[in-house]
Every structure is written in C-alpha cells, then in structure tokens.
C-alpha cells in the first residue's frame, strides 16, 4: 500500500499539460484522453463514461461526465496460469526493439492467449493484425453455437467446476497525470457476486507482471473505498511510441507500393495528391490499442467481451 500511496501523491502533484506530444512521446493530454474515450464508446458501446454522482472525486481538468471509462461484468472463466501464451511478452518486446518485418507491426497487440473467445470471427489465432480496422474487428465477439457444447458439458458434470472458476470483472480506465497515459483498474467478483480479495485478483494477472506491473490500490476516483488491482502505466507511452513508428513505416511502405502500381497504370499525379496523408495511428484510436496490449497482463479476462452487454 506504500507504493499505492506514493502513486496517489504523484498523481496529485504532477502538473497537467495540454500540449499534444502524442506522435513524439506516445503520451496523451486530458483532451486526447476524452477524444479516445469517445471513440472507444462509439465503437464498443458496452464501454461507458461515468455518470455524474456525489460519490465521485472529480478532477477539474476533465468533464464531470468523462472522468473515467467503465465496463461491468466482464467474464473471466479461468486463471492466468491456465492461459498458454502464443508469444511471450519478452519475445514480443524484443521484436519491437529490432528491425524486422514491418508486416508484423501490430503483432504485439494482436498476439493472443489460447482462449475460448480470443480468436476473432473468421480469423485464425496466429494471423498478424496489420491495420487498425482489423484490430477493431479482432476485438469483436465470435458468435458461437453453444447449445450442444453446454448439454455435453452438463452431462459430464462440468458445470459445477465451471461455476467455481467463473469470475467477473469491472474494468475502469482513468487518466494518469503522472505518466500522461490511460491507467487500467480491475475489480473482481466471484460467481455469487462477492468481491474478490487482492490475492484472488492477482491470480488473473500474468505471472510475469504480478510483481512488476500490478499494484493493490483503492479506486482514486471514488470517495468510498473500493479496492482494486491497477496496471501500472510506466511503460505504456514507450510501447505506444514504438507502435506509432512501426505503423508509420508500414503505411508508408504500402503507400509507396500503391504509388508504383498507379504509375504503372499511367497515373502520374498520384504522388502529389498523397503528400498530405498522415501515415500515423490517430490519437482517437489510442484506447483500442491500449486494450489489446493490456490483454498480455490479464490474459484470462475476456476483453473481447466488449461487443456484448448484460
């Protein structure tokens, strides 16, 4: 809790900046956080902004109805140690630090654990994601016909075991003033709706991150004491900066290939018309990417659940 207290003081004392440095640092301003939150809620309506309430400790640099984002009752049907990673985070980050195939630019955020709903509809688990539109599609829920499987499962007496494993999480995304990036908080419940202890919530954090990234702390935006596990945001900006650079390289290469094709077809003015194109990831797409690399920290929480409500 000492670390949590120090973090709270740092958040309180760090001055707010409104100068955008997204493309150069991977950090965002409060205004850009709101912009990215609006986009997330538009694309995935189960994500909501907070409602105004007397229970909230407001920060005056954000609108009262846009202090934090929340999605409730996200399923978690197994523990993190039961998830087999396709690619370990160390391997993925090493790949980012080296000059490799630009086609794998978003493989970091697209890498998934073997999970009942982790594979996008119509996709394969090992397919690389190379565009933000495909990334958005990857977050959608795959429609499955579960009737036959459920009957067989019940016949084998597996339902009781499944209920013991079943958990749900409320996920919160707030703005970190000290790191100028989004910060994730998770609050867990068992199948009966009783709150999970911090130790139980840590079971759903990847072992690689439990002692490095996850912290027990109270939700800072509620006046009432609500215990959570937060995902420390110290590396978020660096990951986003690397990703931005990679996206830029991929899109520039594709544009060059398209230009060459157009020139072969006799379209000589194509290059002049494309000079003002922005090859970077848009700042409003920030949280889409943010949620994808959060899955490496909490692999058993079904983040793909965002396209369905309760």
Swiss-Prot record:
The regulatory note on its activity is: ATG12-ATG5 induces reorientation of the ATG3 structure, increasing conjugation activity of ATG3.
- Annotated spans, Handle region: 238-285
What does UniProt list as catalytic? Answer: 234 (glycyl thioester intermediate)
Instruction: Extract the GO molecular function terms from the UniProt entry.
Output: Atg8-family conjugating enzyme activity; Atg8-family ligase activity
Q: Which residues bind a 1,2-diacylglycero-3-phosphoethanolamine?
A: 1-7
How is this chain modified after translation?
A: Acetylated by NuA4 complex acetyltransferase ESA1 at Lys-19 and Lys-48. Acetylation regulates autophagy by controlling ATG8 interaction and lipidation. Deacetylated by histone deacetylase RPD3.
Family (UniProt): Belongs to the ATG3 family.
Q: What is this protein called?
A: Autophagy-related protein 3
Source species of the chain: Saccharomyces cerevisiae (strain ATCC 204508 / S288c)
Lineage, uppermost ranks:
Eukaryota, Fungi, Dikarya, Ascomycota, Saccharomycotina
What is the primary gene name for this protein?
Answer: ATG3
């Amino acid at each position: 809790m000492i670390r949590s207290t120090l973090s709270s003081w740092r958040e309180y004392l760090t001055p707010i900046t409104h100068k955008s440095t997204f493309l150069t640092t991977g950090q965002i301003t409060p205004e850009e956080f709101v912009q990215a939150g609006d986009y997330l809620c538009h694309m995935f309506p189960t994500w909501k902004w907070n409602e105004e309430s007397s229970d909230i400790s407001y920060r005056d640099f954000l609108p009262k109805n846009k202090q934090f984002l929340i999605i409730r009752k996200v399923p978690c049907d197994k523990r993190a140690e039961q998830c087999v990673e396709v690619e370990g985070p160390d391997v993925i980050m090493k790949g980012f630090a080296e000059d490799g195939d630009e086609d794998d630019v978003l493989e970091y955020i697209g890498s998934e654990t073997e999970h009942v709903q982790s594979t996008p509809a119509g996709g394969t688990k090992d397919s690389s994601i190379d565009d933000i539109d495909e990334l958005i599609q990857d977050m959608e829920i795959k429609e499955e016909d579960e009737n036959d499987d459920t009957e067989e499962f019940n016949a084998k007496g597996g339902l009781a075991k499944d209920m013991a494993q079943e958990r749900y999480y409320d996920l919160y995304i707030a703005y970190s003033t000290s790191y100028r990036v989004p910060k994730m908080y998770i609050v867990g419940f068992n199948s009966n709706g009783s709150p999970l202890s911090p130790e139980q919530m840590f079971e759903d954090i990847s072992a690689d991150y439990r002692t490095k990234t996850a912290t027990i702390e109270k939700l800072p935006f509620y006046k009432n004491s609500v215990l959570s596990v937060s995902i420390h945001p110290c590396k978020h900006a660096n990951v986003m900066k690397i990703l931005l650079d990679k996206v830029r390289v991929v899109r520039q290469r594709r544009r060059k290939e398209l230009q060459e094709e157009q020139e072969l077809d006799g379209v000589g003015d194509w290059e002049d018309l494309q000079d003002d194109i922005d090859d970077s990831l848009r700042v409003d797409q920030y949280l889409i990417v943010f949620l994808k690399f959060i899955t490496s920290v909490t692999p058993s929480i079904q983040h793909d659940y965002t396209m369905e409500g309760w």
